[in-house]
Amino acid sequence: MTADKSLFIRAMPFLFILSWASGFPITRLGLEYTEPFTLLWVRSAFVLAIVVPFALIVRAPWPHWKEVAHIAVVGVTLQCLYLGSMFSALDGDVSQGVAALVAGMQPLLTAAVVGITLGERVTRRQWIGFTLGFAGLFIVLSERLGIGAGTMAGFMFAGLTPIFITAASLYQKKFCANSDLRIVMIVQQA
């Protein structure tokens, strides 16, 4: 492995955190100039402009069409339903703190239903971890939890976010767990 490649691989987690953490501020800024689903389209186009050339260069293997269909179901659930609800909540003047806290319930919701949906057992230790994680999220966001002037529709959209991301996560784990992430990103954004 070359030094440049090694540096890039070591930097990837930090680049991911930077891109993920910038999501709320960039979304809030973008919603000042455009509608939620237009912003989602721009976001998807940006991701595709980066990922498609990369996947072509590395010759990422294209899966069978049945697997593509499963990946597309996850993509619609994540990109349209989850992010569409999140962007609509923020557009409905729900504070970023409240939206993040509600969406942050996803691990708890997933743990609550993973036994029923996938037959997996959640241990006491995992429950403690999920609870501590949610408590940490609450503490970090506590100063930004002002309910503010959010609309009823905005709060309803925020309430849907953990449901949609949980559904997408469980479906992906069941049907797309071994899919090539480069192709997953392309199909989910398309």
Regions found by a protein language model. Give the residues of each.
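Small-residue-rich packing faces within the transmembrane alpha-helices of Major Facilitator Superfamily
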Residues: A21, A45-A49, F134, T166, ...
